[in-house]
Amino acid sequence: MATQIAPHGGRLVDRWLRGPAREEALERARRLPRVRLDAREAADLEMIGDGALSPLTGFMGQADYRSVVAEMRLASGLLWALPVTLAVSRAEAESIREGEEIALEDPGGRLMAVMRVAERFAYDRGAEAARCYGTTDPAHPGVRRLLRQGEVYLGGEVWLLDRPPAPFAEYRLTPAETRAEFARRGWRTVVGFQTRNPVHRAHEYIQKCALEICDGLLLHPLVGETKDDDLPAAVRMRAYEAILEGYFPRERILLAVFPAAMRYAGPREAVWHALCRKNYGCTHFIVGRDHAGVGSFYGPYDAQRIFDHLDPAELGITPLFFDHTFWCRTCGAMASPKTCPHGPEARVALSGTRVREMLYRGEAPPPEFTRPEVARVLMEGLQAAARPQSVET
């Protein structure tokens, strides 16, 4: 068996309780104070349990939080790009004592985990926004969420009990499962691809370029919470299935979902996404134009430049940077400024945002934008989502 890349921090975390320990915790949880998580916190909790956020074993305490916000490092000195926190109101925090256990519920009220609260601490919203998002503007979705959440963070280790029902069950692979599948297929090098947008020709081009140098591709669309105008995850997943069916060698692709919610933290989130994919077993990670960006808050290549300031050995996963890609009418092919000599008049600009805008207007993207099979899936999915649902009486 090929030696696999080590998880971040050296050990793949597993915070799931099983057998008698789980049964005892379930019984205990019935008597514990309950804290309901929002969608992002629930996704983070699931990923902590699965080891996707290794080396984290719970929601961050004050030392880790402050160090990550200020220095992009855990208190231990280990590289880590974004805080992973549990926010509650001041009133809720006053009812919880440090050292006691609480039960954590998903947004629907289903029990997910128990947590031993090691710390309660206030935090500076402005400082977190400025350092992590590069702005304090409430028009930024990450900042807006930060300004609306509770005033106190709870830190402490968690133990997972139940995984709430979720879509795409066949694609919800844990890091241990993706690593096992990579080993089964004999992949020594694996490139991860993160996306929240509908698949288009630029994505296809980048993925195939990466497959020229790696044994396999982990196509890892994010299916957690996104902006309201982002395409529904169910529609995107059907589009990924359609393009894999007709345009990729299936034996070299593993399609799995990434449960995380989007932070829209641009450069920092690009590093965070890379570290997560390292935990899933990827040796390489694609960072394209405006990775994890939103609006005009970041420059188009800020998410690539941040890696210039990181020690490659400490990062432990190789980023693959791609320039802006387009369809060149003269070349009759996908290209980038590195491979095409023709001017702007020959270039058809491609982006997930542009495809999304056309779809919402009811327009089928041209074949230079996306494959016809994919366009059909996207159009049908959006029309079904917009169709009024009948109500039986």
UniProtKB/Swiss-Prot annotation:
Highest taxon of source: Bacteria
One Pfam family named in its UniProt record: PUA_2
Enzyme class: transferase
UniProtKB keywords: ATP-binding, Nucleotide-binding, Nucleotidyltransferase, Transferase
Involved pathway(s): Sulfur metabolism; hydrogen sulfide biosynthesis; sulfite from sulfate: step 1/3
Statement: the UniProt record of this protein carries the keyword rRNA-binding: no
GO MF annotation: an example: sulfate adenylyltransferase (ATP) activity
EC number: 2.7.7.4
Biological process annotations from GO: hydrogen sulfide biosynthetic process; sulfate assimilation
Keyword ATP-binding: yes
Classification via InterPro entries: ATP-Sase_PUA-like_dom, PUA-like_sf, Rossmann-like_a/b/a_fold, SO4_adenylyltransferase_pro, Sulfurylase_cat_dom, Sulphate_adenylyltransferase
Stored PANTHER family: PTHR43509, SULFATE ADENYLYLTRANSFERASE
Family: Belongs to the sulfate adenylyltransferase family.
Name of the featured protein: Sulfate adenylyltransferase
Organism classification: Bacteria, Bacillati, Bacillota, Clostridia, Eubacteriales
Encoding gene per record: sat
